[in-house]
Amino acid sequence: MLSPRNRMRRRADFDTALRHGRRAGRNALSVALFVPQDTPDQPGGDAPPRVGFSVSKAVGKAVVRKRVQRRLRHLMRERVGSLPAGSLLVVRAKPQAALLDYSELAAQLDSALRAVTRPRGQSSHRTRASREATSAHTTAVGEQPTQ
């Protein structure tokens, strides 16, 4: 079970994470992570990271939704320590989440968490040089030969 101090309960916290946080989506879930900037009057270093879950009726009936939520909560219990202090994370389940087994759901959650915690400007799988090389190759291949 996720610790009570790590649970997000207030609507304002959900809204903040969803409106101002970094987002990443996978086919079974999406996540939004908001990391507050430390201010002199409100340092976030001692605040624990908090996690909230959103599992809509599109996922399935109540039993299915609750099972998905329990799985996500258990997965986040193991991962909450890797989140920045004072951060707000919202995990939203999509209908595909009900069809995945525990390990597949864990893989998608890990992938989404890596994407939102990665420093800005870093690509997930390709570097800028490889993107430019790919686009140059595509242009060269697609050109018509001159006569």
Curated annotation (Swiss-Prot):
The keyword RNA-binding applies. Its EC number is 3.1.26.5. It is an enzyme of class 3 (hydrolase). One of its GO terms (cellular component) is ribonuclease P complex. Keywords: Endonuclease, Hydrolase, Nuclease, RNA-binding, tRNA processing. Residues 117-147 are annotated as: Disordered. GO terms for biological process: tRNA 5'-leader removal. HAMAP family: RNase_P (MF_00227). NCBIfam families: rnpA. RNaseP catalyzes the removal of the 5'-leader sequence from pre-tRNA to produce the mature 5'-terminus. It can also cleave other RNA substrates such as 4.5S RNA. The protein component plays an auxiliary but essential role in vivo by binding to the 5'-leader sequence and broadening the substrate specificity of the ribozyme. Belongs to the RnpA family. This is Ribonuclease P protein component. It comes from Thermobifida fusca (strain YX). The gene is rnpA.
